[in-house]
Every structure is written in structure tokens, then in C-alpha cells.
Amino acid sequence: DAELDNDTYEAAEKQYLQNNTKQAISSLSGYVSKFPNGIHALKANFYLAQSYYADGLENNSVANYEYVINKQRNEFTEQSLARLAEIHLKKNDYTKAAPILKRLEAEADFPQNVTFAQANLMRTYYDQKDYANAVVYADKVLANPKTDNKVKSDAQIIVARAAIQVNDEPKARTAYAKLLTIAKGELAAEALYYDAYFKNKDGKYEDSNKTVQKLAKDYSGYKYFGAKGLIVMAKNYYQMKDNFSATSILESVIKNFASYEDVGAEAQTELNMIKGEAAKTNSS
């Protein structure tokens, strides 16, 4: 009956409001199981979720946050959506995070929650190889003047990588050029590598080699892009008719970077091509 419902809830809420987390969990879960559709079911589920979360029991809180977001929009909807998204993202569960983030983007009143949703939808779509949507969200993130540089850098890299994946070279060039001005560490190494890569494609072989040298000197810690840069350098030497330098660089890459299978395979393909061409020239 209503009186028992009210009394049970009030006793539980009191524990919650006094920050007695363990007692709040015990009494709120008692209320929720006794009155699943009780007068205070919405508040009780939200407070129970918050208590679990505060006690480090994030997985336990999911069902109660879900109860809140499945009800008509209420004062706890936005906070529950943000919390659920955070819990799923922490576990890299992008399949569960995506629909929650979409709702948060659409329903949030706080601008920082919209920004959070857009930045994470961008990462989620990229992770799921949905490059078209990843770019849509990266563009939203970049268009937001309040986005901080770290997230802008992430957005720029996603635009660039997605463009490479879908062979949109003009977009990739622009994105990597912008990235070069803001990136640090490994992202800067990646941007420099593509700078050398596009210079090679444009026939600027000397300039491309200078960029590879800068990559090797300033970003020596990032071996993967260093190795890929050396392959570009070998291609430059080949175009400049210096087959000896080209083959010795490629042989060195194959020997020293065997742990990067894609790099080794690319170097081998390039080496086979140069040797094949040389054999043709010698036999003619």
C-alpha cells in the first residue's frame, strides 16, 4: 500500500542523502525489489545506480540507469545517459555505447555532454570501420569552437585516416597537413610520414627524403612510421635512378623491422619490383 511504499522509500532515501553508500545500496535495492513499480521507483533506481557507481560497482549500476533512461524523459535522464555511455566506453563496448551516445547528443541540455557524445561517436564509428559516419562526427567536433586541442587532434587524425581508407586523397592531404601543425608525439610522426608520402607522389623526391630524415631524427621513438618512411625514401631513390641506395634501404627495413608484418611485406614487394625491373634492363 502507499503508506508502506512511502515509508520504505523514505528510510532508503535518508541513507542515500547521508552518503551511507553501503546502507543505501541495501535499502534502495530492497525498495526496488519490493515495489518494482512503486511511487518512487524512478528516484529509487537512479539513487541505487548512483550508489553502486560510487561504491565502484559500475556493472551493477547499468540495469538501474537503463530503467531511468527507458522512462519518459525526466530530471535524471541526461545524467544516466552520460554515465551509461561512460561505463560502456570504459569497456570499449562500442556496440552498446553508440545508441546511448546518439540519445545523449540529441537530448542533452549541457553543451559539454553534447561535445562528449560527438567526440565519442566519432571514435565509435571509426572503431567500427564506419568511416563515413566517423568523418561526419569528426567534422562536428572540429566545427565546435569549445573543443580542446587534444580532441581536435583526434578528430583531425580520424578525418585523415578515414580519407586514406576510402581513397579520398585530397581530403587526406588537407587533414594531414592540418594535423602537422597541432599534433605531438606519435600523431606528429604519422603526419610527417604522410607529408613524405604525398611529396613522393608529387614527384618531389628530394623534399620527400628531407621529410623522412626529419622523421627519423625528431621522432626516432616511433619505429613503425620511421620504417614506413624509409620505404618512401627507397621509392624516392629508385625514382632518382639510384637503385643501389633503394635496394640497400629496403633490405635493411626487411631485416630490422620484421615485427611489423605490413611494413616488411611492403618493403619486399618494392624490392621485388626493383630487382625485376633491373633484370629486364640487364637482359635487354
Task: Map each language-model feature to its residues.
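Acidic, polar-rich low-complexity tracts and alpha-helical solenoid repeat scaffolds
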Residues: 1-284
